[in-house]
Amino acid sequence: MAPTPLLVETARKLEPGRALDLACGSGRNSIWLAEHGWTVTAVDRSPVTIPSVDTHLADLEKHEFVIEESAWDLIVMCLYLQRDLFGAVKRGLKPGGVALVIVLLMEPGHESSPFRVQPGELAKYFEGWEVLHYHEGKPSAGEHHRAVAEIVATKPLTKR
């Protein structure tokens, strides 16, 4: 399975460093990052073995994995929403580090769901950061067709 197109587009512009892939699933993004020089840690509650990647079996909802503070150059969270993780993601990035988050978006005519963000909600979690990409609606690229909110944001070099 191919990596998320937004991840490829974003990571190609960055100097490889330490990457954290939260709720990595099959590991497609972790594999791509590792193949392109990143030192990757992947976390998921389902067992996954990925060559050249430090994998952790952990349930993020139960806080079984602690995100190290100021340790990561890139943190990826694709198609997984746990609102209370955003603070840890922001603290986990080094100054100048990049967060890439793709989550399902609430669509008109659909019932409210705790697994989807409201329009504008994702951007609020990264207020004060440099937003390199923000999109709401059908994915900017990729294989699924559900409405999403996507953000790529850089942590400020100084505290705000």
Where do the language-model regions lie?
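Conserved SAM-binding strand-loop segment of SAM-dependent methyltransferases
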Residues: 52-63
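Conserved alpha-helix/loop element of class I SAM-dependent methyltransferases that forms part
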Residues: 1-17
